[in-house]
């Protein structure tokens, strides 16, 4: 608009609405969202960044409530335990996670596990858990029968389609992202009896009475022994011993660039997850190299991925063990020495005293020299080719090869 010295200048603006075409990525094709009739949820990289968590799976759960991860409170939020995931409900046949084995690894899997597809290639639950979140462009959850129609029975439990970021044409660009992750134990839901309440409850339930006259005095002595400890002020809150506030960190660095015909990217990632159980930790190193080349009607792309993972399990054992120890037992003697055996006899269900069933201190093994860790190295290469024969008619071919080496080290002291 040219200004020529007018006292009043009236400018009329015209509306110019620009809409972004929304599509549904099924892993096989892209379809306009308004024409797709299936139940679907699309999660963008921006959504993941807002709810960043220990891994991609936890982030998806925080965004979409239909992606349900069953918490195993007995394991104390173990960062090395593969989660039990459901998208379309549970199977009618109750099968334990321990009863099924993965085809490619020793992972414990669930019959309700959805299918994971990344850039057109199937990946395992372990690969999904260790995926570098900064590489993800979008995630699409296919939840209904349309997933079965496309993927067969493998998609009956739902399909999670991951699309990774592709480099943009232009000069070399460097990206870095870092974040902290805090794992804090929440014990507020455990409303446990204190030592006196537990002992009184056992007495009211008849644990210290019997019709066997030969065991009656022994039961009275057992009760008095425990009551003596309670009167001395013993009231142990066992749940506090194996847990901590774990602080982890995550870093990712990528370089990308290229022209319209040839594009490339190189990325490195590191994710450290410190579990709420003392000593539990998961360290994952990721590296990837991608290139894409367009020649007339042909497009070639190759994605090389390398993953190094080290998982350290807690020497404190299962969290559930500490919730089962009576609070009238103390972990240390009067001189501050850790006790191996908390009590050397217990009342059996047969109405007699049994000196064989000892009550062991769950803290004992945690203070002994031990090693319990698992490592794996995986190299995976995905190659894809597209030939656009004519507009709307495209021939696609994909080839994937992977190799994984697993190692497990476990040492328990003879003590």
Residue ranges and their predicted role:
Residues 1-22, 142, 146, 152-157, ...:
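Periplasmic N-terminal soluble interaction domains immediately after the signal peptide in Gram-negative
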Residues 2-49, 57:
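Short, acidic, small-residue-rich periplasmic hinge/interaction motif at the N-terminus
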Residues 13-15, 24-29, 71, 87-91, ...:
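Flexible glycine-/small-residue-rich
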Residues 39-63, 71-77, 85-92, 119-127:
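Short, polar/charged loop or turn motifs at beta-strand boundaries
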Residues 51, 63-86, 93-110, 114, ...:
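Residues embedded in well-ordered regular secondary structure
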Residues 58, 103-109, 113-114, 119-146:
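Short acidic/polar hinge/loop motifs at secondary-structure boundaries
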Residues 60, 67, 139-140, 160-162:
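Non-catalytic regulatory/gating segments with a bias toward low-complexity or hydrophobic composition
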Residues 135-138, 155-183, 259-341, 371-406:
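Transmembrane beta-barrel strand/turn architecture of Gram-negative outer membrane proteins
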